[in-house]
Regions:
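Class I SAM-dependent methyltransferase SAM/SAH-binding core
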Residues: 48, 54-98
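Acceptor-substrate binding/catalytic loop of class I
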Residues: 151-168
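A conserved beta-strand element that flanks and buttresses the S-adenosyl-L-methionine
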Residues: 109-110
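Core SAM-dependent methyltransferase catalytic element
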Residues: 185-202
């Protein structure tokens, strides 16, 4: 199987954005995590979704609950779809590795997006996370369970995924002053996702 884009996976989403929006699971397997986080947020909270795609279903969940959200994605096609879906919401065309909004948020989500970054790029993201989080803010992200790379077909394109080892994520979180609130491996109630929830404690 021919391998594709490794460094900038968002370029693949520029090709398959419409397919992805139509075929992404719509059964809200993330619901339990979103419900948990919603209970931790005030009505004045601000949410940043890194790799927001077309905004469904995660940003849509918070929008429907009256929470102020900002979506970031490096794929032009995904941002275009997001703006169509939620015209009153702020969306930014930016690479999550290379931006600074000069804003603080109560929650940062990198759900099924962080793991599209090469392993060498992932450690620096924890600086981005803490730069954009308020004290006691929540970080929610998904990862693999061991260091390595995986390729998977989506919309006729071979999509790159990468992960560090679980111990490496634990070390990075601790070094950047995050307290792990929960870590579920291959959560059967969430499509087999490996889900981290941590709180920034500067």
């Amino acid at each position: 199987m021919e391998k594709g884009e490794r460094k900038n996976v968002y370029k693949v989403y520029n090709k398959i954005g419409h397919w992805f929006a139509e075929n992404r699971y719509a059964d809200s397997v993330e619901q339990a995590y979103l419900n948990d986080i919603l209970q931790r947020l005030s009505t004045e909270a601000k949410v940043l979704d890194l790799g927001c795609g077309d905004g469904k279903p995660i940003l849509e969940y918070f929008i429907n609950h009256g929470i102020n959200v900002v979506g970031v994605d490096a794929s032009e096609q995904m941002i275009e779809l997001a703006k169509i879906n939620f015209p009153s919401t702020r969306f930014l065309l930016k690479d999550m590795r290379e931006f600074d909004l000069d804003e603080k948020f109560d929650l940062i989500i990198a759900w099924h997006s962080f793991f599209h970054l090469p392993a060498d790029d992932q450690p620096n993201m924890f600086t981005v996370f803490k730069r954009h989080l308020k004290p006691n803010g929540i970080l929610l992200f998904t990862s693999g369970t061991e260091r390595g790379e995986v390729w998977g077909m989506n919309g006729g394109e071979n999509l790159f995924h990468a992960s560090l080892a679980t111990t490496e994520y634990q070390t990075l979180l601790q070094a950047n002053k995050f307290e792990v609130l929960s870590h579920k491996i291959n959560d059967p109630d969430c499509g087999g996702a490996n889900v981290w929830m941590a709180q920034y404690k500067p």
